[in-house]
Amino acid sequence: GSIVSAACLAHDLGNPPFGHSGEKAISTYFSEGQGMALKKELSPMEWDDLTHFEGNANAFRILTHQFEGRRKGGFVMTYSTLASIVKYPFSSQLAGKKSKFGFFLSEEADYQKIAGELGIIRLSKPDEPLRYARHPLVYLVEAADDICYQMMDIEDAHKLKLLTHDETKGLYMQFFDEKRRKRIEEVCRIVTDVNEQIAYLRSSVRGALIKECTRVFTENEDKILNGEFEGPLIIHICSPLKEAYDNCSAIAFQRIYRSSDVLDIELAGFRVISTLIDLMINAVRSPEKSY
């Protein structure tokens, strides 16, 4: 439990400002922007790391890298904790269209050492780009991420008035059978504050999803340990809960992530991050100048 808790806290440490749009801004800077001029100075694998920038890989770097003036070993976390944050245990050469991978070229040897010590199954052949099976606890960290962020995004949308109270309540109620819904309605008659009602519903949904993901994990333990289990735990939950979860995901995409306020922030993020990268590159290239 402590390993998973620590990994949950650490796994997003490498995300840039503006979240996933920040990752895209960094990638685009190098693939389409002024960073293209640096391509000739980098190896193909280093270039892949930059043009498919990934926050999870950056988290692994931050946690393990010996930065200037610091002790060796980064944050000096246990191997199990470090392995538990690597959701995509392969190099950027295998990133694909989703640009997901687990470690930069600069930390590839570190992950190989961790995998060797923990006995993590290597899936790639010696002449292929590096790819491993996941550490079993990755599935629990990923499930916690999938559950918490999806449900909290719905609650946040309610607070920001992107979703009405009835819409939000309806999305959460989908997760329960008729008997449980009646009990929830009884609580809501006592707790009249609408934000408290939604917080109670969100917490109840989270509990149901945790219980169901736990079932999926324990029932597929052998496949997980052998590196044969495919996909996150959340896609294998029972049909009623899966349908309700997918409905929340669809609404979040349509009404939250694509809202004008969010898109305005993303556009601003592109400009901010591009400017910051320019300044940092210039500082490295011309250290004699004052900025």
PLM feature spans:
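Non-transmembrane, amphipathic alpha-helical segments
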Residues: Y132-Y139, V194-V205, L233-H236, Y257-A268
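Substrate-recognition/cap regions that form aromatic- and gly/pro-loop-enriched pockets
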Residues: E219-Y291
